[in-house]
């Protein structure tokens, strides 16, 4: 169970304060498709970022599986983001020089999963979104809808409890948008999906619950959690603290250097010129100083 109590968020710029969220109270069920609906600037993305642990609330409390996040340290937040949350954004954020499979594997690499298991789980996730035959393609060889499917596969490969989608169809045509929404609707059968959108048609057609935001406040909720649902016993899911090994980090770094040979060579060449230039200046300075001392 995910619950927000009296959440506020204030951004400060010098002496100016902007209150993005104003006392948000809402609870979410473990399996539902929630659409957060509102115009630009009403606080939708800020709310999504706080739920995903990408931003911190100013006051109030975010309660995850019965535990207050006021008790969370940085490792707890890392574990929450790595294992409990999947992110799907309007921009796909795929690495262009990596294959589709490698892009999906990356989420597991950062979680310290072994190579063999990484590949098996990444292939399974891509098959689930209908891209099992596109494993070796580069992102720039795919359509916008296919790239969004890759992003969804990357989001679900860690089997998160919650999937956060920020305008997932914003950059897609209407036909592709329907395909992506059908896919999200299927995933929502066993996960909590929270989708931010300004499109009421998408919300009414696909979501099981629509929450309306206006000026940082919830002004409508057509299927709120009942008191019995929020007070029900919570099953706490223990997540292990995991991290990428040093060997894996080095392997990724070397692979990145090798896939961008031209840039690596140019960077090394430019660095060499800089080092040689500094050495030459120091040598000339030392030579002039020695000459002056002997005159």
Model-inferred region functions:
Residues 67-68, 105, 109-112, 116-133:
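Conserved ABC ATPase "signature" region
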Residues 52:
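Helix-to-loop junction immediately C-terminal to a conserved catalytic motif
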Residues 137, 157-158, 189:
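Conserved signature/switch motifs of ABC ATPase nucleotide-binding domains
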Residues 163-166:
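Catalytic Walker B motif of ABC-type/P-loop ATPase nucleotide-binding domains
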Residues 236-273:
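N-terminal Sec/SRP start-transfer signal
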Residues 276-295:
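Alpha-helical transmembrane segments
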Residues 79, 138-148:
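Conserved ABC ATPase signature
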Residues 83, 183-195:
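Conserved catalytic loops of ABC-family nucleotide-binding domains
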């Amino acid at each position: 169970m995910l619950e927000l109590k009296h959440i506020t968020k204030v951004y400060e710029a010098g002496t100016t304060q902007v209150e993005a969220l104003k006392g948000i109270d809402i609870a979410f069920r473990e399996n539902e498709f929630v659409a957060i609906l509102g115009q630009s600037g009403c606080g939708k993305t800020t709310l999504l970022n706080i739920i995903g642990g990408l931003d911190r609330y100013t006051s109030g409390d975010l309660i995850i599986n019965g535990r207050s996040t006021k008790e969370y340290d940085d490792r707890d937040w890392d574990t929450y983001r790595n294992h409990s949350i999947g992110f799907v954004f309007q921009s796909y954020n795929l690495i262009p020089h990596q294959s589709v499979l490698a892009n999906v594997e990356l989420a597991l690499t950062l979680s310290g999963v072994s190579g063999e298991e990484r590949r098996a789980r990444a292939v399974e996730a891509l098959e689930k979104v209908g891209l099992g035959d596109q494993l070796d393609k580069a992102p720039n060889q795919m359509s916008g809808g296919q790239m969004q499917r890759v992003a969804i596969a990357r989001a679900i490969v860690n089997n998160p409890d919650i999937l956060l989608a920020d305008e997932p169809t914003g950059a897609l045509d209407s036909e592709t948008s329907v395909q992506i929404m059908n896919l999200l609707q299927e995933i929502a059968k066993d996960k909590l999906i929270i989708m931010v959108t300004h499109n009421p048609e998408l919300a009414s057609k696909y979501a099981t619950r629509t929450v309306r935001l206006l000026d940082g406040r919830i002004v409508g909720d057509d299927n709120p959690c009942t008191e019995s649902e929020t007070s029900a016993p919570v099953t706490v899911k223990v997540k292990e603290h995991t991290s990428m090994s040093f060997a894996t980090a080095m392997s990724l770094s070397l692979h990145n250097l090798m896939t961008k040979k031209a840039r690596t060579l140019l960077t090394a060449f430019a660095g060499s010129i800089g080092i040689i230039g500094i050495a030459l200046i120091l040598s000339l300075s030392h030579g002039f100083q020695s000459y002056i001392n002997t005159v």
